[in-house]
């Protein structure tokens, strides 16, 4: 059976990973394509 500490560590690691994935997605999406938008 999984303990409370193991569940807390797993959920924290999963949350940090998903947060960094969203940040990386937005960073990549904002900095690719649309080269004319930066000229304004």
From Swiss-Prot:
Pfam families: Ost4 (PF10215). GO terms for cellular component: oligosaccharyltransferase complex. Belongs to the OST4 family. The chain crosses the membrane at residues 5-25. It is found in: Endoplasmic reticulum membrane. Keywords: Endoplasmic reticulum, Membrane, Signal-anchor, Transmembrane, Transmembrane helix. One of its GO terms (biological process) is protein N-linked glycosylation via asparagine. Component of the oligosaccharyltransferase (OST) complex. Residues 1-4 are lumenal. Subunit of the oligosaccharyl transferase (OST) complex that catalyzes the initial transfer of a defined glycan (Glc(3)Man(9)GlcNAc(2) in eukaryotes) from the lipid carrier dolichol-pyrophosphate to an asparagine residue within an Asn-X-Ser/Thr consensus motif in nascent polypeptide chains, the first step in protein N-glycosylation. N-glycosylation occurs cotranslationally and the complex associates with the Sec61 complex at the channel-forming translocon complex that mediates protein translocation across the endoplasmic reticulum (ER). All subunits are required for a maximal enzyme activity. Residues 26-40 are cytoplasmic. InterPro entries: Oligosaccaryltransferase (IPR018943), OST4 (IPR051307), Ost4p_sf (IPR036330). It is a single-pass type III membrane protein. The keyword Endoplasmic reticulum applies. This is Dolichyl-diphosphooligosaccharide--protein glycosyltransferase subunit 4.
């Amino acid at each position: 059976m999984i303990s409370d500490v193991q569940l807390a560590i797993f959920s924290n690691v999963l949350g940090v990973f998903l947060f960094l994935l969203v940040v990386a997605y937005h960073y990549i999406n904002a900095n690719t394509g649309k080269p004319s938008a930066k000229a304004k």
